[in-house]
Amino acid sequence: MTVTTKQEWYLEYDITINRPGLLGDVSSLLGMMGINIVTINGIEEGRRGLLIKTDNLEKVKRFESIVHEIDDITITKLREPELRDRLAVRHGRYIEQDATDKKTFRFEREDLGLLVDFMAELFKENEHKLIGIRGMPRVGKTESIVAASVCAHKRWLFISSTLIKQTVRSSLIKGEYDADHVYIIDGAVTARESNQKHQDLVKEVMKLPSIKVVEHPDLFVETSEYEMRDFDYIIELRENKDQEIQY
C-alpha cells in the first residue's frame, strides 16, 4: 500500500468584504479541492490565518488562482509555515520582529503565554542555540525561561541567577552535562562575579552543543569573549511597549 505524504502550508488572507458565510465558502472551496484545514484563527483585525495540508502542490496553486478572481478576500501569504506563522494561528497575533535586526523579537508582559510558547518551540528543535533575553528586573524573564523548558520537556540548570536567591555555580556534576538541558546564565551576575572557577564554567558551558539562554546579554558580552552577533535570537521583554530597558 502506498502512503501519500501530505505537506502543510500557511495561508493568510485579508477580508475585503466581510459578508456572512465567507469563512464557510472558503472552507468549502478548500475541501472541494482536496485541501484539509489543520487550524484556523483570526490574525488581528480583518485577517485570517490557516494551516492547510495537501498531497499536491498543484491543488494549492489552483486554489490560489481561483481566489484571485474573488473580490471578498485577498491572499497575503501562501507558503511553507514558519514558526511565527504557527504561533500566529495558535495565538491570533504575530510576534513583533525588529524591522532591521530579524533575530530580535519583542514581547510585553501581557504576552508571557506567547513568549513561553515561542521559546518552547525553539527549545524543542534539539540543536545548539544561544538566546539572549533583555528586560528590567521582575518583568518575567527567568520565569518564562523555566516555563518554556517545562513545556519543551527539558531540564533547566542555573549557572548564575537571582531567582529566589543568588546562584553562582563553579562546577557541574556528571549528570548535569547533557545536550538536552537548557543552561541559564544571568549575564549581570556573571559579569560582576570575580570567582575564576565560575568564569571557567561559563566558558565550558558556552561550548556545549546545547541550548543556552543568557539574561542581560549586553552586560554578558562586556566581560566575555562573545559578541552580540554570536546570539541566534534576542528577546526583549517589557512591562509595556513604552518601557525602556536600561542597565
What are these regions (language model features)?
Residues 113-126, 132:
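Hydrophobic, well-structured mid-protein blocks that either form specific transmembrane helices
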Residues 156-218:
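Conserved nucleotide-sensing/catalytic segment adjacent to the nucleotide-binding pocket
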Residues 1-113, 121:
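A conserved regulatory-domain signal marking ACT and ACT-like small-molecule sensing domains
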Residues 127-160:
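Glycine-rich phosphate-binding P-loop
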